[in-house]
C-alpha cells in the first residue's frame, strides 16, 4: 500500500464558496447572487479585458517564467526594486513557497486563530508544529501573545491584516512594536490581500518598513480589488536576499500568460480601483446600518466583506439563504459558529440580500 504522508490525513482540500451554476441547478433557481468569496462585484478594469483579447492569441506559448514586464511595472508602482518581488499563482502559492522554504518537522510556526486557513494548511504539510493564538475580543491579532509563542524553533509568524475572516486590522503603532520584538531568525509575514480596500488612517504603509526589518515579507494579490481572481496572480515583497533564497521553491511558469497581461494592464487603471473602493465603503455602510437597525453585532471591516453575528447556527442560516438564491460563507468552518461572512456586492445586490435576510430574522 502507498505510504502517504501521515500529516495529510488530518487535512481536507480547501472548500471555496459554492459555484453559482451548482446552486441554480440544485434549487431550480434562475438567479443566484454569490456573496461568499470576497470577489470584486464590479469585475475588472476594461484595460485588463482589452489586454486579454490580445494575449489570448498567444495561448500556445509558455508565459514569461520571470514575469519580467509585470515585475517591472509592479516594482515601479510599489516603489521597490524588481529583485524585491516574487510572483505566484495567487498568494496561495507564495504562502506555499514560504512554507516549503522555511518549515520542517523540527520547526514551528505562529499564527492567529481564526485567520486565513492556508498558513496552517501548508505548515501541516511540511510537518511543522502549528502554534495558534486566539484573537482579541475586537477581532484583532493578540500580538503580545503571539510574541510569547515564539521560540528558537519558530521559523515563520503570520499576521493577516486586514484579517480574514474578521476584516479587522493591525495599526501601524501595534505592528511596528510587534516587528521590533520578532527575533531576527523568524520571518514575519504580513498578508495584505485586502490592502487596496483599507481606509483606516492608522493602517501602516509596510513597504518602507522592509529596510528596517530584513525578516519582513508582505503579501498582496490581484484577486480582490483588481478583480482578477480567476487568473491567479499574487506576489510577495521582501529583501532581495530573502527573495533570492526562496525563488528556487517557485514552480516554473507559475504565473500564467493571461494573468500577467491582465495584471499589467490593471495596474495602469488606478481610477477603477478608487471607484471600487468608494462603492465598497458605501456597501459596508448598508450592512452596518442594517445591523444597527436589527441589533446585530459585527466586526467593523477594512475589507470587502463583513462578519456578522446572527446568534443562531450559521450552517442553518446559510442553507436557508442558499435556497433563496444567496451564497454566503458560514462562519462555522471559520471559527465563528453563529456568524456569517458576507461579501459586499453591488448596491442592488446588497439591497436584495438584506431585504431577504430581514424576512428571516
Swiss-Prot record:
Catalytic activity as recorded in UniProt: L-histidinol phosphate + 2-oxoglutarate = 3-(imidazol-4-yl)-2-oxopropyl phosphate + L-glutamate
Enzyme Commission number(s) from the entry: 2.6.1.9
SUPFAM superfamilies found in the cross-reference section: PLP-dependent transferases
One GO MF term attached to the UniProt entry: pyridoxal phosphate binding
GO biological process: L-histidine biosynthetic process
Cofactor requirement: pyridoxal 5'-phosphate
Pathway entry: Amino-acid biosynthesis; L-histidine biosynthesis; L-histidine from 5-phospho-alpha-D-ribose 1-diphosphate: step 7/9
UniProt keywords, alphabetically: Amino-acid biosynthesis, Aminotransferase, Histidine biosynthesis, Pyridoxal phosphate, Transferase
Pfam families named in the record: Aminotran_1_2 (PF00155)
Modified residues (N6-(pyridoxal phosphate)lysine): 224
NCBIfam families (UniProt xref): hisC
Subunit structure of this chain's protein: Homodimer.
Family: Belongs to the class-II pyridoxal-phosphate-dependent aminotransferase family. Histidinol-phosphate aminotransferase subfamily.
Entry protein name: Histidinol-phosphate aminotransferase
Underlying gene: hisC
Amino acid at each position: 500500500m502507498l505510504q502517504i504522508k501521515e500529516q495529510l490525513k488530518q487535512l481536507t482540500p480547501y472548500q471555496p464558496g459554492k459555484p453559482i451554476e451548482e446552486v441554480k441547478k440544485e434549487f431550480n433557481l434562475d438567479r443566484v447572487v454569490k456573496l461568499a468569496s470576497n470577489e470584486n462585484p464590479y469585475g475588472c478594469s476594461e484595460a485588463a479585458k482589452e489586454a486579454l483579447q490580445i494575449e489570448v492569441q498567444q495561448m500556445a506559448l509558455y508565459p514569461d517564467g520571470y514575469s519580467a514586464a509585470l515585475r517591472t511595472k509592479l516594482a515601479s508602482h510599489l516603489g521597490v526594486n524588481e529583485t524585491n518581488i516574487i510572483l505566484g499563482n495567487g498568494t496561495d502559492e507564495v504562502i506555499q513557497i514560504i512554507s516549503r522554504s522555511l518549515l520542517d518537522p523540527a520547526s514551528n510556526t505562529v499564527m492567529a486563530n481564526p485567520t486565513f486557513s492556508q498558513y496552517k494548511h501548508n505548515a501541516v504539510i511540511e510537518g511543522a508544529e502549528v502554534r495558534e493564538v486566539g484573537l482579541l475580543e475586537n477581532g484583532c491579532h493578540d500580538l503580545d501573545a503571539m510574541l510569547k509563542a515564539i521560540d528558537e524553533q519558530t521559523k515563520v509568524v503570520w499576521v493577516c491584516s486586514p484579517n480574514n475572516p474578521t476584516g479587522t486590522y493591525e495599526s501601524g503603532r501595534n505592528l511596528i512594536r510587534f516587528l521590533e520584538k520578532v527575533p531576527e531568525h523568524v520571518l514575519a509575514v504580513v498578508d495584505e490581500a485586502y490592502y487596496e480596500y483599507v481606509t483606516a488612517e492608522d493602517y501602516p504603509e509596510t513597504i518602507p518598513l522592509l529596510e528596517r526589518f530584513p525578516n519582513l515579507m508582505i503579501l498582496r494579490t490581484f484577486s480582490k480589488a483588481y478583480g482578477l481572481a480567476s487568473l491567479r496572480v499574487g506576489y510577495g515583497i521582501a529583501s532581495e536576499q530573502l527573495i533570492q533564497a526562496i525563488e528556487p521553491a517557485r514552480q516554473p511558469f507559475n504565473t500564467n500568460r493571461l494573468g500577467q497581461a491582465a495584471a499589467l494592464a490593471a495596474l495602469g487603471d488606478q481610477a477603477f480601483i478608487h471607484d471600487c473602493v468608494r462603492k465598497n465603503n458605501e456597501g459596508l455602510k448598508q450592512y452596518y446600518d442594517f445591523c444597527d437597525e436589527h441589533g446585530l453585532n459585527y466586526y467593523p471591516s477594512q475589507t470587502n466583506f463583513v462578519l456578522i453575528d446572527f446568534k443562531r447556527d450559521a450552517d442553518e442560516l446559510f442553507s436557508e439563504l442558499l435556497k433563496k438564491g444567496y451564497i454566503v460563507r458560514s462562519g462555522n468552518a471559520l471559527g465563528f459558529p453563529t456568524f456569517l461572512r458576507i461579501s459586499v456586492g453591488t448596491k442592488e445586490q446588497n439591497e436584495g440580500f438584506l431585504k431577504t435576510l430581514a424576512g428571516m430574522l
